[in-house]
Amino acid sequence: NDANFICGYEAGCLGYTLYHQLTANNVNCVILAPTTMLEQRSRRRIKTDKRDAEIIAKCLAQHNYSPVHIPTATDEETKEFLRMRDDHKLALKKIKQQILAFCLRHNYRYDGNSYWTAAHIKWLKSLNPEELYKEILDEYLLTYTTLSDKLERLDKRIEELASKDEYRESVKKLCCFIGIKTHTALSVLVEVGDFERFASAQNFASYLGLVPGEDSSGDGQTRLGITKA
């Protein structure tokens, strides 16, 4: 009767949904960060649901894992909005590539200095391919315009989200750094959540994956890329 039960699952496609469902029913639950599970290497060659469950149980019993930080409801929905905006950004990048590829295939060469300026857009709209090719280009350009307008609207909405009481001051502080604007600042805040959960700057750098790698011995020094060490 005095036993304390805890359940857990690996971070993945389920997100936080299962966690919220379990905790809402008074079930103690944690989400395990896969890279911190000390048993994970043993399952590279053999992977079954039963084996995965056994590994999770061992990690929970022996505390051989780090729990995933659970964001607040506001942080979680803001993170989803930022992810949706980034999806549109990628879609815009793709349609730009498709338009340029279309022009290249049909030998339309722009003599200006830069693509996607007002002059370049005007040039694209002035092209007059024959028959169905004209319709294809028009559809590409319509998609480009729609995505550009939508991205501008989403960025304005992000500015509004960043002005909320829980984000306003922190966003202003982060924007003091060169290269950081509202979108990046807000992304950092909702991803990190509580900065006080990091005991030191080293821990925070490790979380971000910004620790310089090194492979040195004796007088020889080799600098490597950034890591989560």
What are these regions (language model features)?
Residues N1-A229:
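A detector of single, family-specific signature residues
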